[in-house]
Amino acid sequence: MNSATLTDEQLQSLDARIQSIPIVETLGMKINKLEKGHCEATVPRHKRWDGIYETFHGGMLGTIADTVTCWSILTEIGADAHVATTDFNIRFLRPCHTDVVCKAHVVRIGRTMCLARADL
C-alpha cells in the first residue's frame, strides 16, 4: 500500500481498521493505494462467487464497491469514525470475468453525510 497524501500513522490506523473487517479476508481484498479521498483495491475472481452466467456475481461486486468507497471516506474523516451506507446505486455495464480493481473517490464530505463513487 502506498500514499503520497497520508502520514505513516494514518496509513497504519486505516490498515488496522481495514484488516479488522471480516469481508476483507473472505474476499482476499488487497489495498493497492490509499490517498486522501481515494482508495484502490483488488479482489481476485473465484468461481465460488459467480452468478448464474459464470461471471462475478453482481451482489459481490456491489459489496466490493461499498467497502472500497467506505475506505475512501475514512481517509478523509479518520479511521475511527463510525460510518454506514445510507444509499447505494450500481449500474452494471458488462459482465465481469476477471479479477476486480475498484477505484473509489470521495465526491463530497458533508456535516453528517458523505458522497463517494466507485468504478470497477
What are these regions (language model features)?
Residues 1-120:
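Terminal targeting signals and extreme-terminal segments of soluble enzymes
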